[in-house]
Amino acid sequence: MTFNDKNFMLKNQAAKQLYTAVQDQPIFDYHCHLDPKEIFEDKVFENIVDLWLGGDHYKWRLMRANGISEEEITGSASQLDKFKAFARTLQRSYGNPVYHWSAMELKNVFGIEEVLTEENAEEIYNRLNTYLLENKVSPRKLIADSKVTFIGTTDHPLDTLEWHQKLAEDKSFETIVAPTFRPDEAFIEHHNFKGFLDKLSQATGKEMTEFKDFISAMEDRIAYFAENGCKASDISFTEIVFEAAEESELNELLAKVKDGYKPNALEVKQWQTAVFAELCQLYKKYGFVTQVHFGALRNNHSKLYQKLGADVGIDSLGDQTALTSNMNKLLDNLVQKDALPKMIWYNLNPSYNIAVANTLANFQANEEGVKSYLQFGAGWWFADTKLGMISQMNALAEQGMLANFVGMLTDSRSFLSYQRHDYFRRILCTYLGEWIEEGEVPEDYEALGHMAKDIAYHNAVNYFKHE
């Protein structure tokens, strides 16, 4: 079997036939970390290292595992030396998804079919840089070539959304770039919580005297995002918690923290529970899809964190007790308050996949006719792999309805990451193809092909009500 040919990752005849239904579908990338300013300015990339390795902690993590010095990863080594160091790493990375993604990016974006190795690294480095300049490769070109119709960025609640506004006014660019409301700093354990309170007060003209003042100010920002085309929120929790508190307790806690008090574990849980519930009520009011990423233990290597900051490849998947108990309480609390928005839950630890899918199935009832009102999101981060994707789809198929799944997202900082949609589609087609080959479903290529197309694109469009 040939590596990275037209049948890459398509493991059976049924998969190859199903893939014809999805291979030319556009991309609806509803969650990523691209910078809207870069999209608007649309500068031509001059060096492949900036485009391919810069900010990519997946690659940095691999390079450290291969004994590469930090100088050649995030330091001041030359661009060529960094590229060679990555090539030296990549040729030993069989089995890691970065190996597959990189090969697909080289072939499908740049037309380079050779396997990148240390021996040919300099030649390919020069060819890639020549390609960038001759073809004027820029963010918008990469987006257009990948047929991306929608991009959901990740944005601070106090962002001016200046660059989203400029993109919306630019009629020469057809892709919609919408902000996503990401209020990490609204949670009391965040190191910048006090600073966020001050800036929120300045932005809204509201004093943060009581809990209700804080929520009112947050609504002002949510309304502003809605006015600027926002369709979703996002949050990242280390753990899913549920710990009820009286409003008087929250008022007292807010006052103490403003005076420099460090909250204890119980108070952190109480604040998270209360704030998230209030935000969900607002998200429902404003029609935001609520995305919940959970289970990441971040910044574990303290020296690298102090030197380089966050998102540099030193994070892990976590575990927790009472996950389903807390999830059920949290979701039921929202139901009781008529505050349950459409939600996508992304679980980082695959050992919880069945439990999460099973819990979400308890709360699908809605009078709006929404299919899978609560979504079990695609394999995230360390689960964004072949086995991770299959594990997530298995759990969803067994506990819910895979046919209603909103499918893949890049969750990436790289303009080359759209190849991950194709990677997912190939794995999806093999997964569905195995059902056909093993006689688990009827050999109905029209029905299964329609299902694959829905998962690849149309379900997300409908779920986010993209027009």
Curated annotation (Swiss-Prot):
SUPFAM superfamilies per UniProt: Metallo-dependent hydrolases
E.C. number: 5.3.1.12
GO biological process: D-galacturonate catabolic process; D-glucuronate catabolic process
Keywords carried by this UniProt record: Isomerase
Record NCBIfam families: PRK02925.1 (NF002794)
Keyword field contains Isomerase: yes
UniProt name for this protein: Uronate isomerase
Taxonomic lineage: Bacteria, Bacillati, Bacillota, Bacilli, Lactobacillales
GO MF term set: glucuronate isomerase activity
Substrates-to-products reaction catalysed: D-glucuronate = D-fructuronate; aldehydo-D-galacturonate = keto-D-tagaturonate
Gene coding for it: uxaC
Pathway: Carbohydrate metabolism; pentose and glucuronate interconversion
Family of this protein: Belongs to the metallo-dependent hydrolases superfamily. Uronate isomerase family.
Gene3D superfamilies, per database record: Metal-dependent hydrolases (3.20.20.140), uronate isomerase, domain 2, chain A (1.10.2020.10)
